[in-house]
């Protein structure tokens, strides 16, 4: 697909996509596409923000189609060096840097609010410009002063680049706001940079802002923050002091906490996918009166139709559909298949999901499978494309098979069980898609997995029963035990779980329900200012 982006001066809804649609395959990207395609009555724009255009030596490529009602797409990178203005020695504004110091103090201490002046886009374009922040004498004085006051034992170069990288995106985002098309409703699918951009846009245009959190962004950043390749402050381990990394990590954690609250405060509606996430939002600073649950929905009829391609007694294939990244804990799944294979030699583990995001982790997973005698040799991937065809992978003697991102309508009919071994999830669409295709699920107790598998909407949902099983995280033996239980088809457990999953997804998680809920919210807001909607719903 060539990178010919649609552009428009005017859209109904602007979605802010942080590292997801249209480049990165995954659940949030699929949700964005589903929302746009399922809402043809509105015109949409997407503002994509990523870290860098070149990742692991390769340029990001478009991974999803553009629906007809996607009228505008723009792409920005927060940490590409070519976004910085040319260096020039300047003094900088005293008053402006007092505000920057207040901003810094608000990031440093979660109890402090972000200064009100920073809600105004003119602060970033007139008071303290991007050039002021990068090159002025007052900026250097500010960084030097805060370093001496807070962490003089940390190497200055580490502190300098951390502080720069924390603050730099704010000016990049402010510049984006100035050039966005005319928009009726802003919608962020996460807090973080996307949520900050949404809040800043809403303040600038006085237009409504919706926030939909698929996972709890701040909590997930605490898990994987130091894995980003733009946070570079390595030091020989023998020379490290325990507090060195703790202070710099705390700076990042507080930053994401703070911009999350900034987005919560500005959002007219704060949406989550399940009750557990709603409670976490409130504990992180969201106004409970603004929160609402809208579960994901799937195209039940299309997926249910794939059951005609299913064998009456399926092969003993356990499929993990998800990106091959550490947060999905693919290694625990591989270990679980090894344990299960000692009791059930015919079992196979299929890994179906994007492999281009973390090539080092993909290599580690393949090497583990080879060392456990579950895989014969390493596959070579060019982006998401394997050096083996899907047919060759399926027919190989391997017990662990990597398919890359694939059409689940072809994968699910061949799968007996679906699994997730993740250490963090929001509300995984893949579980619901599996239910609709007649595939029970064994998953770790993260996000809404328990609610989906055991029921959580209401008492009637719970009474339906269990459409699979839940285990603890990082417990391959527990996963293996459940795989063996369900794949012993004679005991009737698999058939019972399949029927419960089909009933649950039909009753509570149809795509039409999800789209109807968003249509109601959009219709209620689309002709109003932020203030008018605030008065209407409060």
Predicted regions and their residues:
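Nucleotide-activated donor-binding/catalytic signature segment of Leloir-type glycosyltransferases, i.e.
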Residues: 239-243, 362-405
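Conserved donor-binding/catalytic core segment of Leloir-type glycosyltransferases
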Residues: 301-339, 350-352
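Carbohydrate-associated surface elements
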Residues: 276, 297
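Short glycine/serine-rich donor-binding loops of glycosyltransferases
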Residues: 428-431, 449
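A short, well-ordered alpha-helix in the C-terminal region of glycosyltransferases
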Residues: 463, 467, 492-508, 514-520, ...
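Conserved acidic donor-binding segment of nucleotide-sugar-dependent glycosyltransferases
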Residues: 455-476, 486-491
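Aromatic "clamp/platform" in nucleotide-sugar-dependent glycosyltransferases that forms part
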Residues: 423
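Short hydrophobic beta-strand element within catalytic cores of glycosyltransferases
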Residues: 440-443, 447-454, 460-462
């Amino acid at each position: 697909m060539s990178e010919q982006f649609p552009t428009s001066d005017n859209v109904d809804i602007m979605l802010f996509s942080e590292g997801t649609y249209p480049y990165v395959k995954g659940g949030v990207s699929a949700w964005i596409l589903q929302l746009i395609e399922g809402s043809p009555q509105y015109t949409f724009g997407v503002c994509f923000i990523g870290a860098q255009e070149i990742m692991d030596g390769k340029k990001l490529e478009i991974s999803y189609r553009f629906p007809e009602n996607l009228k505008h797409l723009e792409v920005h990178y927060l940490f590409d060096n070519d976004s910085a203005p040319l260096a020039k020695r300047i003094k900088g504004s005293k008053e402006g840097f007092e505000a920057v110091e207040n901003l810094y103090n608000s990031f440093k201490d979660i109890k402090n609010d972000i200064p009100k002046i920073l809600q105004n886009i003119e602060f970033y374009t007139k008071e303290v410009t991007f050039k002021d922040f990068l090159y002025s004498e007052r900026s250097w004085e500010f960084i030097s002063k805060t370093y001496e006051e807070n962490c003089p034992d940390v190497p200055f170069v580490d502190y300098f680049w951390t502080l720069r990288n924390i603050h730099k995106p704010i000016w990049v985002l402010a510049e984006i706001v100035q050039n966005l098309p005319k928009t009726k409703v802003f919608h962020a699918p996460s807090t973080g940079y996307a949520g900050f951009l949404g809040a800043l846009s809403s303040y600038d245009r006085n237009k409504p802002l919706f926030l939909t959190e698929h996972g709890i962004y701040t909590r997930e950043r605490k898990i994987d923050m130091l894995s980003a390749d733009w946070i570079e402050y390595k030091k020989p381990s023998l020379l490290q002091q325990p507090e060195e990394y703790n202070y710099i990590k705390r700076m990042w954690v507080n930053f994401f906490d703070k911009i999350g609250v900034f987005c919560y405060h500005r959002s007219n509606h704060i949406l989550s996918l399940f009750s557990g996430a709603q409670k976490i939002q409130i504990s992180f600073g969201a106004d409970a009166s603004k929160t609402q649950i809208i579960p994901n929905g799937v195209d039940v009829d299309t997926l249910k139709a794939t059951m005609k391609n299913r064998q009456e007694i399926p092969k003993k294939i356990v499929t993990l559909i998800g990106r091959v990244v550490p947060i999905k804990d693919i290694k625990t799944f591989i270990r679980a298949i090894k344990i299960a294979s000692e009791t059930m030699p015919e079992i196979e583990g299929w890994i179906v999901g994007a492999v281009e995001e973390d090539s080092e982790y993909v290599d580690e997973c393949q090497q583990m499978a080879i060392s456990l005698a579950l895989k014969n040799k390493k596959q070579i991937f060019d982006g998401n494309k394997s050096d083996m065809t899907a047919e060759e992978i399926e027919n190989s003697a391997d017990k662990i098979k990597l398919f890359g991102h694939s059409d689940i309508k072809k994968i699910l009919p061949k799968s007996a069980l679906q699994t997730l071994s993740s250490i963090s999830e929001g509300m995984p669409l893949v579980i619901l898609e599996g239910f609709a295709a007649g595939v029970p699920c064994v998953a770790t107790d993260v996000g809404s997995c328990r609610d989906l598998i055991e029921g959580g909407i209401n008492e009637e949902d719970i009474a339906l029963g269990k459409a699979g099983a839940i285990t603890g995280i990082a417990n391959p033996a527990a996963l293996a035990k459940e795989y063996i239980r369900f794949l012993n088809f004679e005991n009737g457990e698999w058939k019972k779980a399949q029927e419960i999953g089909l009933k649950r997804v039909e009753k509570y998680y149809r795509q039409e329900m999800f789209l109807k809920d968003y249509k109601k919210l959009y219709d209620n807001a689309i002709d109003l200012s932020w203030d008018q909607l605030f008065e209407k719903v409060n």
